[in-house]
């Protein structure tokens, strides 16, 4: 029995090692802004939900954190990486949108003030039970009595609000519908840094499902590219420079115009794959998970616009 117990303990230890999170990639942007970059998959039982990026902005007495991870365990893992660059507490969390991989981890930071757009806050408040259930099912991680943090401070739709938080000047931009109806862009004018949420992703197939692609292209053109950007932390993937933003904009713009052209010429949804430059999309992560649903979503969007 003693040997069986030892074997069981070893199996448990081996299992724990097997599912350990990969290290957070910490990138210093400047003396007070750091990117915490994670893997780029979709939440599943292999990655246990660690698929996200976070921006750390070190203020006078505390940290402003952009997004919070998929759940408490992921947030704890990211926080350990944060503590390698500063011991200051997280006092504010800026949530870029309501998708659960970006905010369910906020409950880990019990004393932090959470800010988001009005739409995002409503989605979290009304949908938190299903969000928790879905993330638990997808990742196999049990959250116990998870109680997602509903944002206490909200940004009105379509507004641009300048704020000073912890001595740091920020502009919080609630743009038109892009990745979702309630995206929040966080602009640091003194640093030239933009945290875009999933309005921008890098080497990752974007998710069009909850947004509007034509409007999304407009947000990149009229809002993001109007800023004197030096560095972008996207929702997923490596840091971006201006050339990367323009390349992404052109890809999603071509995607929309290809679907629209086929529709207006009385083609079929099945024709889209024959006309898109699929090779460039295949080179990016999440291709298999996203391409079919993205084509369908944009086809329905174009159909509605021309009904």
What residue ranges belong to the model's regions?
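Cleaved targeting-peptide boundary
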Residues: 18-25
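Conserved beta-strand hairpin/beta-sheet module of binuclear metal-dependent hydrolase folds
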Residues: 30-81, 184-196
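Bacterial N-terminal signal peptides
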Residues: 5-15
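Active-site HxH/HxHxD metal-binding segment of metal-dependent hydrolases
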Residues: 75, 80-162, 181, 257
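Accessory terminal helices/loops
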Residues: 11, 19, 225-227, 239-307
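Acidic/histidine-rich helix-loop elements
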Residues: 37-52, 126, 130-133, 203-213
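Divalent metal-coordination and catalytic microenvironments
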Residues: 32, 57, 67, 82, ...
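Metallo-beta-lactamase
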Residues: 62-64, 70-72, 162, 169-254, ...
